[in-house]
Amino acid sequence: MSQSDVVSQTFRALVESADRKFGRVRDLPLHGNRSQNHHSFHKVFKAYMRLWKYQQENRTKLVESGLNRWEIGEIASRIGQLYFNQYMRTSEARFIVEAYVFYEAILSRRYFEGVKVKDLGVRFKELRFYARFLLVSLIFNRTDMLNLLVDRFTHLVDDCKTNFRETNFREWKLVVQEIVRFMKADKAFTNIRPLRYCAMFDSHPTSLPYVARFHAKKVLKFKDAILTSYHRNEVKFAEITLDTYRMMQCLEWEPTGSFYPKRPVVFNDHSGASIDHSGASGVIDMNFAADLTDPTLPPNPRKSVLYRPSVTHLIAVIATICEELPPESIMLIYLSASGKAGISNVSQLENSGGSKKSSNNNVLSRISRKQNSSTPEYHINGTKESSDYYENYLWFGPRGNGGPNNLYPGDIIPFTRRPLFLIIDSDDSHAFKAERGETAALFLSPLRPAFKDQSSADTTQNGSQFTFFLTAPLQAFCQMVGFTSSDSDSDFYSDAEKIISTSFSEWEVILCTSTSLDLVWAQVLSDPFLRRLILRFIFCRCVLSLFCPPEDSEQYLPVCIPHLPVSVSPKSELVQSSVRRLANHLGVAEYFKCLT
């Protein structure tokens, strides 16, 4: 047996060993068992690094033995997939960076394109590579790369349909449609500012000393979050919906300006550039990942993103994470789903037999109500009797209206034994006013969205308005009043962001110096992510209270439990003045009562 044969056999054995380990890690649950997951990841990562190093050291002999370029691309793709899966388990930024580095190298070195392959199996590998790279670029917020990948991916699917006419590529066409729809829904105002926590926008020098000095009797650390949404026909890509994507981004750190360098995306298929594709090059600049990582930032809170979970699976994940939650920590649960009847948008409400009612100032969309409203009747103290914990619910199910698909307020009560920050975004969110047990922090969305332009009210096209306010308040404000990014330049929006930033700084001082701030809020105020959510809630509530007619206030206003101080209520002159400044700056003050 020649030396080349020995090298080839060793290489194949390493491939098989790594793939077996990869299969075991891929099938592990994404949630819980941190130590076990870390150990398993380390083993499979070590196997692939050994394989990668071996092919680099023996590349010439492997090429002589018939190694194809796409085989190197498949190994790199597996490593990228491994990193991405670990990112989804841990939310550690370095893993999404490493995944991006490997996928970008595959694309730039054209591992799947070096030879015109007519093998259907290889084409499917290439299609899967593009789909995975699209998801990584989306989460990594690489807009230029996304645009390039969508164009490449679309052409690849069309080429596969032409060359493999007997094969059905309908599923891949749906993938193309999904990403195009997602990017269309998320493209407005994308250049204003990142959704992630950014020191430039979210750390306010004026109020920083007050935040630094603030100390409650008990301080909780934000460690874990569960994010899920379940609506009919909602905007999504792969297993990431638009609402959960926005929340994911909102709960991560944005590196400082010197990081995430905007390397130009230049991969011209027809430029004639002298790129050597004759050999199976396996060199990837793994040091580039260090250039994309900001070592000054603390770790991201771990996020468990559930795609269309069953109620039993959702409860099981909550229980697992509660069990593993470190002492003196708090868990955030974000639930976006339709209420009682499984109605997910305004157009469905109107088709359900409801009557229309326009606002007095003709600003609000004509949002219909059901003649027999499902809004629960609450007692004077804003709560319900314990027998009502299982009367209203969120709806997690593909069809029908059966009990197994219903998540009741009472289902959450056992988990309030641990500190809980609960965000309910639903047309039946106020049912969770009945939630009892240990006191939890609650944000409950309005029962109805409010827009100047009725077409914007369709959550299946634009996502939830409440979630948008919590994750991108200026963009949500502009969408509500029908103000588009084409209406003005970047400096104009930068000034609008400064108005919001100044307001948030003022409100931070109020919260940090308030003597009436409930302990539930005080114990999380030191956390930058949760504090930012509180400030954005204050903004959202005041905006909607001034935008909506008073007789419909309960339908269109969000609720927080327990109450925040009166000094940051919608009736506060200081809070209203902030909305006034923003509305005047954008030239939309006539849409708000008491502002003109």
Provide a role label for each language-model segment:
Residues 98-226, 230, 502-541:
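Cytosolic small-GTPase signaling regions in large eukaryotic proteins
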Residues 51-70, 108-121:
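Flexible helix-coil transition and linker loops at the boundaries of alpha-helical arrays
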